[in-house]
Amino acid sequence: MVDTSSVSARLEHLDELVTELDAIRDGGRDGYMAQWRTRLAAEHALQLAIQTCIDVGAHMVSELGLKAPADYRGVFESLCPAGLDARLAERLAAAAGMRNILVHGYLDVDDEAVWAALDRLGDLRDFAAAMQRIGESGRAAPEK
């Protein structure tokens, strides 16, 4: 059985992070590029948002008895049998790669790539909606 209260709390945190990232994006590219603190805030919030998706996804994989992933990127593919859209899973796997750069490759962080990621925040919201739906069902979707 999926611990919906734990998942819901994490998804609420994800929503707060994405809302802040939306506000940064709404400030415009020029302001983003000109302000080191804004870029730093975006990088950190994006890292936390992606990590939250990974954590929720890993929890769901475990609770639903799905195939254990080999790495963070694989968490999203493992959720496809439970009903996560495969195209969304691919985009989220790429986001996990961005998270790795934000965590480990701080000298290699590309401001343009982070800015571009702010245009894909809908993927994080779509993931949250899918996890809410799958969590409420409490079981993996049947294999097709």
Stretches with model-predicted labels:
Residues 1-144:
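Solvent-exposed interaction patches of small proteins and small membrane subunits
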